[in-house]
């Protein structure tokens, strides 16, 4: 973990390793070397997803896939994603060290661009692999500088030859991830047994008003796009409390034009996002925010439009995988709790391919997506041990 954290390290102990950047190439090269050293058969698909395979005793048995991602948020933490990939690698090393054979092959994976920071959407590599996104459409995506995804993938040398699709049926997919929330720590638990992932909806609203001088223009003459935006943003904060304990709402982006201290804003675009374990609750939150936008536009005399940017239904993990993780935690003597993930992960897409499960490691103070993200080594070990035992159980090996 410390070694991988040096690649893209920030001055404040975090990680800046965006997808398809030079730092991403460096960590991919490092990970490929680690897999080869561990005796794995390595392959890279046409979207840059990296796989390493350890053979099982039954050549016809479906593989168990374990992994996460190595890209990071801008100035993010060293555990997000990387802990899951390193734990998968350590699983292989432990099996090798103890000469443990499994009936099913075990594969480990580093998914391309889980974070969605440089190229959107998030969970891009697993989404293409699982058939949720079109390959050519995702190849054409650009970042803020106009760099094209496919060009950047080729530039770093990770546009592989394998098709970006499952080459065979899979027995199961397991993913270890830091919780990125406070619930495990608040409840003094060692690990989290994840039962599913919240659904979410993201969108953007744009109000169109009229720019004017901020001094001579009377208040009743104004068509202020930012006033309407502020009204709706305040409702995005309030709506979740009326819907459920696990409902959350966020405005993470706002752009005002002409963005001058002396001009009434004529155009404002901002985003909204809601998450909840219930798809019905998510849709109700979306309906309410659009209703609030319509009212705000009428009050201020504005035109407005909205864009649905991304939706993902809530995911319920397979009982067999949840039970395997729960049994592993119990057998190891860890105090665990079953928990719904409040964030999206590659497991969201893998759910459509095969039985899927997740393990959460404790996040100190619930912090993530920033440089202060922290999980103790004891908590890393607990989560890694749990997913290792669960994977071996599903793969038909002795723990």
Where are these regions (language model features)?
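Acidic/His- and Gly-rich active-site-bordering loop/insert found
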Residues: 1-77, 95
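A short beta-alpha structural unit
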Residues: 19-20, 250-259, 271-273, 277, ...
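Flexible, glycine/charged-enriched surface loops at secondary-structure junctions
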Residues: 43-45, 101-105, 161-164, 216, ...
